[in-house]
């Protein structure tokens, strides 16, 4: 059987602000898809598997932010951390509350000049959603 190759454009190619594509390790495609797509409102841009029923490697994105999710054990370990800089962390928080997403730490002001919140995915990866205080609508 021929390998299945990914198609679609890399979101970071269109976003000069983003030059690095982090990868988070996941252990269950179904659980992660439910969390990231249905819970957090990301879209799946593309998926790649070498064969059917093999581990997935995929890109998710939302509002110009993108990262990879991988079931491949050799790519990285669970328990990673990514920072997502957004214009209004409070709007994202309100949306996550409506969607029933459990937020580990609600938005608060940090010592780094940010207003941020922390979400933990089903595999223990942390997503820190941040707004720079200079950009925050007070």
Segments the model singles out, each with a brief description of its role:
Residues 106-108:
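Diglycine-centered glycine-rich loop/turn motifs
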Residues 32-37, 96, 121-124:
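Conserved active-site tyrosine of GNAT-family acetyltransferases
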Residues 52, 75, 110-112, 132-136:
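A short acidic/small-residue loop/turn micro-motif
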Residues 2-33, 80-82, 131-138:
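N-terminal beta-strand motif that seeds the catalytic metal site of vicinal oxygen chelate
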Residues 68-70, 118, 128:
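Conserved beta-strand in the GNAT
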Residues 16, 23-65:
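Core segments of cupin and vicinal oxygen chelate
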Residues 18-28, 58-61, 72-99, 115-120:
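Vicinal oxygen chelate
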């Amino acid at each position: 059987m021929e390998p299945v190759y990914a198609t679609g454009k890399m979101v970071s190619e269109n976003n000069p602000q983003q030059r690095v594509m982090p990868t988070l390790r996941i252990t269950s495609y179904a659980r992660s898809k439910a969390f990231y797509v249905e819970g957090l409102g990301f879209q799946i841009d593309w998926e790649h598997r070498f064969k059917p029923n093999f581990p997935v490697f995929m890109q998710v994105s939302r509002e110009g932010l993108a990262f990879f999710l991988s079931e491949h054990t050799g790519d990285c370990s669970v328990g990673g951390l990514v920072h997502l800089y957004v214009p209004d962390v409070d709007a994202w928080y309100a949306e996550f509350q409506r969607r029933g997403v459990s937020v580990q730490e609600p938005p608060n002001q940090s010592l780094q000049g940010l207003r941020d919140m922390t979400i933990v995915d089903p595999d223990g990866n942390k997503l820190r959603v941040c707004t720079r205080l200079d950009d925050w609508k007070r």
